[in-house]
Amino acid sequence: GFKHLMATFESARIQTAARATGVAQSALELGLGYARERIQFARPIVEFPRVAGKLAWMAVETMVARQLAYFAGREKDSDRRCDIEAGMAKLLAARVAWSNADNALQIHGGNGYALEYPISRVLCDARILNIFEGAAEIQAHVIARGLLAGRN
């Protein structure tokens, strides 16, 4: 019973991590696309250091979240206990999705709030990822409990 339930949580959290990574990637692509198209002071805003820096960090964090989700998935596929790894993947990917959506919205400026721009929907999608399949605080608790038990 309980072991089966925990295995279900592992799978669900890995799936949520994958979904969150997709949302993070979408936010990155939307931010990059808009930054290439938006002209300010006679040049695309992607050429401005702050915008380029945001995009670079979005790409780095998305890659890290993706790799952690892949790692947790491999552990699960190998029938190894991976509640800590699944929790880490879900926690990180959800935070990266939210951060990327927020940064992409910032790149869009006021246009990001307009429903014509998909980033407004991505922002909503990103927010819920920190809540379902265990809130971020629950994920942190699961991870800490595992670390204290010596499972790292």
Regions found by a protein language model. Name each.
Residues H4-N152:
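Alpha-helical interface subdomain recognition
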